[in-house]
Amino acid sequence: MARAEGDSWDVASSVGATAAMVAAGRAVATRDPRGLIDDPYAAPLVRAVGIEFFTKVADGEFDMTELDPSSAAEMQARIDEMALRTRFFDDYFLASTAGGIRQVVILASGLDSRAYRLPWPDGTVVYEIDQPAVIDFKTSTLAGIGAEPTAERRTVAIDLREDWPAALRAAGFDSAAPTAWCAEGLLIYLPPEAQDLLFDNVTALSATGSTVATEYVPGILNFDAEKARAASAQMRERGLDLDMPSLVYHGERKHVMEYLTSLGWTMAGLPRTDLFAKHGVPMVAHDNDPLGEIVYVSGTYQNR
């Protein structure tokens, strides 16, 4: 079903189901002996969502590289990228807090468990913003397995298309304190104008010394829906009907690094190939990736 203004979802439908997909990838990466990431909560969260395909992947009952033996290396590269994407944002948060930041905001937090698994310094407050059904699901699921946050976790149950800055302030957010902002895997699900507004709001709430991390996804500009559907054909054959082209907003939008720079941020970009090289992971080109050469970006705010 195509996106519509004001649409909503839970963790098993629409955009919400993509959180289970990402969490399944983190579960696979956690089992990987290379130890790129450690997310002990990924698999329990995926099981609780209840999408059979993702549960089998998360539990190791199905190997994603077996979807298409002719492109096993390409699929392994996709799995590795999920691990490295997670590692990029993990390292970003650790660097931000090592620099003295004690206020963190995760935008569209989904099934992100960083508030429970990262070694946050004493006094760190982690705000998670997402739709109410998603927030409630994760909170209750992790409480049910006895998980406890490693920072002060404050949830902000609101759609990012609503007045989330006001809701964030109401939860105790201090705009006078530097903040580490994260928009991981979010921008492709926002219309172009909503992407700009998101970062306008982030900037308005940021004190000097705040940091931000997100991705630049060039393939969304000239998104090939048929290529995307072809890439997931084998998953559909196994009962997973997740039509990604209907969930993303494609077409012209501003380059996120350039836009943030114009707002007073000093930005740096790490292309996917360099991210792989940084961690010594072999990169297998997959030319049929509809999202193109993703760049992982981070920056620091200088103006106030």
UniProtKB/Swiss-Prot annotation:
Entry keyword Hydrolase: no
EC number: 2.1.1.-
Family listed: Belongs to the UPF0677 family.
InterPro entries documented for this protein: Ppm1/Ppm2/Tcmp, SAM-dependent_MTases_sf, SAM_mthyl_Trfase_ML2640-like
Pfam family, one: LCM
BP GO annotations: methylation
Keyword annotations: Methyltransferase, S-adenosyl-L-methionine, Transferase
One example GO MF annotation: methyltransferase activity
Entries under NCBIfam families matching the protein: mthyl_TIGR00027
Role according to the record: Exhibits S-adenosyl-L-methionine-dependent methyltransferase activity.
Domain of life: Bacteria
Positions that bind S-adenosyl-L-methionine: D130, D159, L160
Entry protein name: Putative S-adenosyl-L-methionine-dependent methyltransferase Mjls_1071
Transferase keyword on record: yes
Lineage: Bacteria, Bacillati, Actinomycetota, Actinomycetes, Mycobacteriales
